[in-house]
């Protein structure tokens, strides 16, 4: 898709100064379009090697469905949260007679672009995707939409593309977690989060900040760190805890980061939760495998996957009207365990 951008019905429509619907009818030889206009559009399409997504078209307009394959892009296979989402997608897709084709972006923009191209060439009937951390341009997503392939974002949504999405309520999840830390005695709470280029990062940070302000605590920039994995957490936490005004609470953007904080604090001789409290965000399997078990925000990954697949299938089969953008928000739940008082 990078070397030669596929011609889309939108491009043809722009060339002739007509609507995409008119182009679609002309390519299907509809008598509603004049013979001359049909011939001109069809010739232009042939000359420019236009290839419509026939699988998506057949699914959208016919009960005969020869190939029902959904492309799924996940950032990391190893992450429990994304694995649970994938499980939800597969269950919902299978229940409707669809198979899934899965690829991992490994948090790399270039790899994500290649996957989109591969899915396009393999004629998937729709794509469910969570963008990579490294993604900084969105042309590859827009091109898919322009070629008529339904696209649904989950978790990490792309605000630069008008497409359906399923997200958790990151703001309230963070707000409730930080409020719990404050209400159980913490007044200096550190925030470990991802880059603010991601919408989920902005929402979680705003939830953290607003919880502090609601409880009369002024946010301290010195307590905010760009850190979203265990390795980095173990590296930067000693400096934080050895500072002249150390935090007595931590809110981390995911469980792995929170567990890195927990491990480091215990190695330094701090008692958890007596000396410091820690809260994560995911509620994966590792949250109950650490000592003490982790207080965390449950994201309900399986539910996210089910909803994303439900929307995608709705777009493909036409039960969701063409052009309608579905936005679904999944509520979080605070799971209180041993790392908070």
Can you annotate each of these PLM segments?
Residues 80-95, 173-177, 199-218, 260, ...:
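Short, solvent-exposed amphipathic alpha-helices that sit
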Residues 107, 130-176, 197, 256, ...:
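Flexible loop/hinge segments that line or gate small-molecule binding clefts
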Residues 2-8, 46-81, 85-87, 96, ...:
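N-terminal helix-turn-helix/winged-helix DNA-binding helices
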Residues 236-341:
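Flexible loop/turn connectors
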Residues 1-64, 341:
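N-terminal helix-turn-helix DNA-binding module of bacterial transcription factors
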Residues 175-217, 222, 322-339:
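An alpha-beta-alpha
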Residues 164-191, 203-210, 230-239, 258, ...:
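Hydrophobic alpha-helical segments within soluble ligand-binding/sensing domains
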Residues 93-104, 191, 209-231:
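Short beta-strand elements in bilobed, periplasmic/extracellular small-molecule ligand-binding domains
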């Amino acid at each position: 898709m990078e070397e030669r951008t596929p011609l889309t019905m939108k491009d043809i429509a722009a060339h002739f100064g007509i609507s995409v619907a008119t182009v679609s009818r002309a390519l299907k030889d509809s008598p509603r379009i004049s013979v001359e206009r049909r011939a001109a559009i069809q010739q232009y399409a042939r000359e420019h090697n236009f290839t419509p997504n026939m699988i998506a078209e057949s699914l959208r307009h016919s009960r005969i469905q020869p190939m029902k394959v959904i492309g799924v892009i996940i950032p990391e296979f190893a992450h429990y949260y994304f694995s649970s989402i994938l499980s939800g997608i597969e269950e919902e897709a299978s229940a409707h007679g669809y198979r899934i084709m899965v690829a991992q972006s490994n948090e790399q923009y270039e790899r994500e672009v290649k996957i989109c191209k591969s899915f396009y060439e393999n004629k998937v009937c729709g794509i469910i995707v969570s963008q990579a951390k490294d993604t900084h341009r969105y042309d590859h997503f827009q091109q898919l939409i322009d070629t008529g392939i339904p696209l649904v974002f989950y978790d990490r949504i792309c605000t630069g593309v008008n497409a359906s999405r399923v997200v958790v309520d990151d703001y309230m999840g963070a707000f409730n977690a930080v409020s719990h830390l404050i209400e159980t005695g913490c007044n200096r709470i550190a925030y470990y989060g991802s880059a603010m280029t991601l919408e989920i990062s902005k929402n979680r940070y705003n939830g953290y900040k607003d919880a502090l302000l609601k409880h009369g605590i002024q946010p301290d920039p010195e307590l905010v760190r760009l850190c979203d994995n265990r390795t980095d957490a173990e590296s930067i936490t000693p400096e934080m805890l050895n500072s002249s005004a150390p935090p007595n609470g931590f809110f981390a953007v995911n469980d792995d980061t929170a567990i890195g904080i927990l491990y480091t604090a215990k190695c330094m001789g701090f008692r958890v939760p007596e000396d410091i409290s820690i809260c994560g965000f995911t509620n994966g399997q590792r949250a109950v495998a650490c000592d003490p078990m982790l207080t965390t925000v449950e994201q309900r990954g399986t539910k996210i996957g089910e909803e994303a697949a439900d929307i995608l299938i709705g777009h493909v089969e036409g039960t969701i009207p063409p052009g309608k953008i579905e936005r679904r928000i999944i509520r979080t739940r605070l799971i209180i365990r041993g790392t908070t008082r």
